[in-house]
Amino acid sequence: DEFIRQKYPLEKGKELLALFSNRTNDSKLKEYVSTDATVSTIYEFVVGIAWYYFAGKRIDLLSSYNLTLSANFEPLVHAGGGQGDIVIYEDDKVVMLEATLMNSSSQKRGEWEPVLRHSVNLKIEEEINGSQRQVTTFFIADEFDSNTINIWKAVAAVPMQSSVDRENFTENVVIMPINSSELSVLTDKSDEYDKIIDDVHSLFEVEKNNFDLNWRDEFIRKIV
């Protein structure tokens, strides 16, 4: 990751991250990062760089990207729809980053389904493989709709079904919203990286009240 450290030192990463809040900065971003990529793709790329510093530079960032990189390690095309934008595997944890420049209203239409699907499928995949790794998704955007924030929290309270194998379910899916400015601050907290992720999981712990997956069917049978 010497390329990242040389072209994108910490302060440059912060500077670039701050530019996304104003779309008049699009040309600056393309000029510095990649003229061949969309600004949305560049956002995924820069979010990864910020996370690299938050993680204390210990992750293999370039292999964690699901976006397409050029021979010069410049972003070209954003991640495809079947997988998360950035998936970081470590011995004890898997962190998935889902980054979007959609505004708070558009996120409901464009992000709720794929982010949830990717998060559920990744967690179930890890459970099937018996890895025992902690799985966390961070949903990163410049702004959030309050319903988006609360929907992600509520998801942890109910069993979720795999879209790959309908026989498989998982619980306590963790999707934590973090905005761009908050991520920028976190880049200076690499010594707290593991603790912060553990704290996120504690925040999402819910009481398991034996959620009944057949609640709707049972009710409908009574009224129809």
Where are the model-predicted features located?
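Catalytic core segments in nucleotide and nucleic-acid processing enzymes
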Residues: 2-224
